């Protein structure tokens, strides 16, 4: 096994951070720890509660054979701000590229409060690499800060923003559709997003808010990728978390679930909001591997390949080839 690299090289990303934010005082005290011990990578923000890669296999009954093993990496709820600095986002991008996904899906809330955050975070995300490209939808914070400005910034980085639209993916002679909708309450139009997709065609929907899963299930969507909930962000022992007002948000807080024949994965996200704290709810980078489902309905729950909730985790267990 070749040598492993610390993520990111400190001088390189510190220079980027200083370029966009100046030399921060508070940010220096909130910087994440980087260490490499015994062939394992630790990437843990002491306030953010750690970062893990969740590798999970998803069985889809309508997935064509040509997309067997297709890997989707999901990044959600980045919330770039003073408390989620650019060097942390850059580290996540570099880690994501090491996982060599077929598609990167960005499920919204790139920024928290400031329009000045849009261009810098978009430039960092422009470094994402995937065989089938990078697709994105916008979240509620993105619409509050400036949806058009963010969409333009992402497009300049060759990131396709699916605003009530869809895209056709082709692989080994097979078709797979990826649709995306604007956020719930900000113009989400599922009918427009899937218009033109053949009936019964395998379709993956990107929707920032899991409240849209019921509508997706009614329309036969195969898989929904969402975020928004942060997994609760702070998880109290015994009490758990109380998040959201809708039945969908209360039920679909994090991880894999299903509603009828429609499966959903809700990412805990990589950032924080309101307070720079995660407790008993580490940030995550989901890596979802799709497989054609050829079993009976009772066995349709996904097979867990590996969960990496808490750093350190071994890069070799995730199939990451070192340089």
Which residues does each predicted region cover?
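Solvent-exposed loop/turn segments at secondary-structure junctions
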Residues: 110-112, 140-144, 167-169, 183-186, ...
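Conserved beta-sheet core of the metallophosphoesterase superfamily
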Residues: 210-289, 294-296
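Acidic, histidine-bearing metal-coordination/catalytic regions of metal-dependent phosphoesterases
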Residues: 1-71, 82, 316-323
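Acidic/histidine-rich helix-loop elements
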Residues: 40-48, 75-88, 111-116, 142-146, ...
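Binuclear metal-dependent hydrolase catalytic cores centered on His/Asp/Glu-rich metal-binding motifs
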Residues: 152, 156-159, 163-165, 171-207, ...
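Active-site neighborhood of phospho(di)ester-bond hydrolases with catalytic His/Asp-centered motifs
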Residues: 73-76, 103-109, 133-140, 162-165, ...
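Beta-strand-turn-beta hairpins that frame and shape the catalytic cleft
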Residues: 51, 60-73, 159-160, 167-179, ...
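Core catalytic region of metal-dependent phosphoesterases/phosphodiesterases
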Residues: 81-170
């Amino acid at each position: 096994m070749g040598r492993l690299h610390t993520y990111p090289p400190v001088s390189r990303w510190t220079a980027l951070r200083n370029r966009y934010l100046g030399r921060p005082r508070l940010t220096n005290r909130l910087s994440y720890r980087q260490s490499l011990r015994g062939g394992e990578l630790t990437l843990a923000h002491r306030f953010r509660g750690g970062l893990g890669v969740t590798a999970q296999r998803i069985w889809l009954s309508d997935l064509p054979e040509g997309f067997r093993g297709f890997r989707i990496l999901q990044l959600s709820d980045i919330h770039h701000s003073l408390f989620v600095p650019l060097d942390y986002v850059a580290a996540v991008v570099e880690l994501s590229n090491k996982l060599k996904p077929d598609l990167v899906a960005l499920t919204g809330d790139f920024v928290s409060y400031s329009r000045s955050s849009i261009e810098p975070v978009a430039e960092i995300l422009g470094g994402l690499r995937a065989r089938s490209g990078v697709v994105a939808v916008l979240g509620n914070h993105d619409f509050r800060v400036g949806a058009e400005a963010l969409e333009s910034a992402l497009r300049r980085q060759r990131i396709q923003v699916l605003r009530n639209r869809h895209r056709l993916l082709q692989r080994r002679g097979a078709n797979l559709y990826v649709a995306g909708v604007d956020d719930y309450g900000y113009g989400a139009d599922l009918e427009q997003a899937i218009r033109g997709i053949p009936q019964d065609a395998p379709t993956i929907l990107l929707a920032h808010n899991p409240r849209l899963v019921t509508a997706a299930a009614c329309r036969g969507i195969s898989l929904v990728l969402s975020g928004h909930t942060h997994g609760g962000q702070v998880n109290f022992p015994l009490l758990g978390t109380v998040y959201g007002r809708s039945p969908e948000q209360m039920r679909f807080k994090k991880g894999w679930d299903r509603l009828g024949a429609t499966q959903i994965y809700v990412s805990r996200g990589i950032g924080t909001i309101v307070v720079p704290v995660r407790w008993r709810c580490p940030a995550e980078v989901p890596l979802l591997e799709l497989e054609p489902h050829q079993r009976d309905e009772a066995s349709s729950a996904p097979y867990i390949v590996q969960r990496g909730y808490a750093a350190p985790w071994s890069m070799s267990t995730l199939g990451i080839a070192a340089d």
